[in-house]
Structure formats: C-alpha cells, structure tokens
Amino acid sequence: MEYHQAIWNIHFPESKEQLIKAKKRLIFDEFFIFIAAMHMITSGEDLKEEGYKIGVCKEAKELVKNLPYELTTAQKRALNEMAKDMASGKVMNRLVQGDVGSGKTILAVILLLMCAKAGYQGVLMAPTEVLAAQHYESFTELLESYDIKIALLTGSTKAKEKRETYQKIKDGEVDIVIGTHAVIQDKVE
C-alpha cells in the first residue's frame, strides 16, 4: 500500500482489511525511520549540516515560571539538554518519549517559543488532525501573551486557507506551524 493510501485509509478505511493494511504500512514506516535514525546516531557520524544558535529567552523562563504546575525532574533535564543543544549551533536530533500526559507537549511549546523569539519559524507535526487541532488550541492558549503567530495546517484545511497559510509561512508572518503531514508538502516554504 502506498504511503498516501495508508494515510487516507487510516482515517477513512473502506474496509477492516484496508485499515489493517494501512496500520501495518504506517507502523513499518515509523519503525524504519526510527531504526535508520538510531543507526545514524549510534554510528558516530556527526551531521555536517550547521544548525542555528538559539538561546533560552526570558519569555521561555517566564512561561515555565507561570505554569500552573512545576516541571518534573525528567522534564527539566530533557529541557536543559535540548536548550544546550540548541545553543550549540549544531543540528539537534532528539526523541522525547513518554506516556500520554507525561508532559512532552509542554517541552515542545517552550522550545518552539525559544525559536520564535530568536527570529526563526518552527513546526510541530502531529500524527492526526485531531491531535494537531488540540495542539493548536493548547499552544495558542499558552502563548497568547507572547505575540507568537501560530497557524494550523492539515489535509482537511480548505484550499483557500491553505494558500493563505502557505503565503504567510513564506513571508515569515507565522512563527509556529502546527499540523499533520501537510506541513512537509512541497508548497510549504
């Protein structure tokens, strides 16, 4: 099954058999990418590509301070490690693992806020439109007082709205893009 067919059938299966095939295809892709990434990391090959130096901004510190809860020790450790990587100017490859509700998203919010305040655009890609919409709502709420422009881009976004969003991204009018695989289409510049 082709990748685009698998994406379609995972959301709108024509039959139970199509759903199973789509699920197997997407699981295979996920494991293949994971294994390839792990091989790159463990092979000791540094990426030759230069990254951007992005430091911790006062807004990120303020956001953490104003959360209605304290970050866990594991979250603080992961955040500090990733912030150090971002400040190094090297390309960062990280996998943040955790159960549902363990606090992975808040780390993404903080790191993407740092990117935006440093003058860069950032993207959060979610596996489903429902999750992308949830992230869009939570990011918008958490970052409302930081003058961050956030866009939602999914497969079901209407064509006119997509064109407008593509243009805003290209023109630098969007700081953070949240979406599904639609965010990695050729039209996104």
Segment roles from a protein language model:
Residues M1-N66:
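Upstream accessory/linker segments immediately N-terminal to the RecA-like ATPase cores of bacterial MutS
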Residues E49-Q97:
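Conserved pre-motif I regulatory segment
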Residues Y69, E81-S88, M92, M114, ...:
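Conserved helix-loop functional segments at active or binding sites
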Residues N93, L107-Y136, E144-K149:
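Conserved SF1/SF2 helicase motif Ia
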Residues G103:
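Conserved glycine(s) of the Walker
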Residues L131-K168:
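Conserved helix-turn-beta segment of the N-terminal RecA-like "Helicase ATP-binding" lobe
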Residues S156-V177, I184-E189:
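Conserved motor-coupling elements within RecA-like helicase/translocase cores
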